[in-house]
Amino acid sequence: MEKRTSYCGELNEAHIGQSVVLHGWVQKRRDLGGLIFIDLRDREGIVQVVFNPEFSKEALEIADSVRNEFVVTIKGTVHARGEKAINDKLATGKVEVLAEEITILNTSKTPPFYIEDGVNVSDELRLKYRYLDLRRPEMNNIFKMRHTVTRTFRNKLDALGFFDIETPYLTKSTPEGARDYLVPSRVYPGNFYALPQSPQILKQLLMTAGFDKYYQIVRCFRDEDLRGDRQPEFTQIDLETSFLTKEEIQAITEDMLVDVVKEAKNITIDKPFPRMTYKEAMDRFGSDKPDIRFGLELVNVSDVVKDVDFKVFQSAIENGGEVKAINAKAAAANFSRKDLDALGVFVANYGAKGLAWLKVEAGELKGPIAKFFPEEKATELKASLQAEDGDLLLFAADKADIVAASLGALRNKLGKELNLINEEELAFLWVTDWPLFEYDEEAGRYVSAHHPFTLPKEEDIPLLETDSSKVMAEAYDIVLNGYEIGGGSLRIYKKEVQESMFRALGFTDESAKEQFGFLMDALEYGTPPHGGIALGLDRIVMILAGRNNLRDTIAFPKTGSAVDPLTNAPGEVSEAQLAELKLETVKKETN
């Protein structure tokens, strides 16, 4: 096989007159009046190859037998296309290759779908034939971008003096967080390793070890319910550093992300990134990861409506809840009564018991609850919401968390439906000053908002075991276009604080020692102040590539039900394998 001289997509007018050897796949073959044209594709693009009997009759005869997705080697000369033959849709559209020789390296069955962008095919079929799906130029380009993003992160961290250190994939299962993927031990029957949800504890131990600056591009595993921006296995840009403030860690993160966006998209992002406290994010946007590319902010109108004779509002306020509203500017005409009923059904998915609404027409409030607003109250409400003719006012009344969840989700939905979002914009945001704990209704107790190793604010440490709800954390999340792309914090580095943290989470001293004794021991040997952040590589690439599902950024992903249609994983194993591991499967009885 002759050595390749160029990639197909690299050929241009500078190559005219040059002899080239190309390897690739046949994208398309056309037979036109004794001439055969082949579009040859490789990872860099497509070029047109012409087979002319006057130039090589033998090559023409072989080309006649070629079909789509055959793998071939072509030797020929680069020529300029005629003016009328120029194809502006191709990067190589001003040139073509006049073939002298063609060698068929392998044939191909007819693929189950066309290998081209925009093909209408189910996700299940794409994943079953993922190796064909990845041939499509748009998929190829995503993985070029992923390579660029990964390389840029690595180069930046190397330049900043971070050590790339690997941590083990076979670790110990620990509570808190999502479910672990467990790996049975053959040597110790009945015992299990866990695949890491993150290298959190181990990277902290590397700080105890004195490495000062660590990073790793690491695969993580979480057995959790899936959605478009989650996968059971995913990749993090993970870093940890000693003796730095959280502001310094944030500055490093910003520098990396600015470089990544410049390299991947050739877009310049201003820094420092805007900052917002967790409380402000929840109050204004109903989300701890707000998309700040558009408005539709939530406005608390409890004080305005507390005296109106509408029982839904009154009841919510009397029971310690609140009433908030969104003003969808100039959107009243966009929504019929049926549309508004559908929005009510939508917010019910987030716990809301309903969605009240008003429209502003000719200076007056119109709608089912307009009768509860006398002129003075109507004027006050319009002023508080800056409402004008044509505006649509949407209200939720309930406990604060339900109001935030329902109106926050509604805000995102309306942002898309009303075309308020500039899809080309990249809006980074730091969300800071998080509560250390959040209340888990199902468990009936407080759990870590991030993880049990997050450092409380110094002034709140005395409250850890007495008033958990008031403790604030030295934590920070980085958000991009409404997606959390990273989370970080300063870490607990003193044993007595970590012990207090575990007690606040409901651990006995004995259970904490059993689960985390190795960490507690390390904290007695001069662990330095340290902190870090983990950035979601797959999610960053998804956003930069303009996709809406993580599957498109992972070479061999799982479906929404955590199945791999390509390999049919997960699958059963043999009785012999189970016996070797001292395991039995429990069969469900059927009637």
UniProtKB/Swiss-Prot annotation:
Q: Give the signal sequence positions.
A: none
Question: Which SUPFAM superfamilies is this protein grouped with?
Answer: Class II aaRS and biotin synthetases, GAD domain-like, Nucleic acid-binding proteins
A Pfam family hit: tRNA_anti-codon
Q: Which GO terms describe its cellular component?
A: cytoplasm
Question: For this chain's UniProt record, which GO biological process terms are given?
Answer: aspartyl-tRNA aminoacylation
Segments traversing the membrane: none
Record keywords: Aminoacyl-tRNA synthetase, ATP-binding, Cytoplasm, Ligase, Nucleotide-binding, Protein biosynthesis
MF (Gene Ontology): aspartate-tRNA ligase activity; ATP binding; catalytic activity, acting on a protein; nucleic acid binding; transferase activity
As for family, the record states:
Belongs to the class-II aminoacyl-tRNA synthetase family. Type 1 subfamily.
Q: Read off the NCBIfam families from this record.
A: aspS_bact, PRK00476.1
Q: Which HAMAP family does the record cross-reference, listed alphabetically? A: Asp_tRNA_synth_type1
Q: What is this protein called?
A: Aspartate--tRNA ligase
Task: Tell me which species this is from.
Answer: Listeria monocytogenes serotype 4b (strain F2365)
Q: What is the lineage of its organism?
A: Bacteria, Bacillati, Bacillota, Bacilli, Bacillales
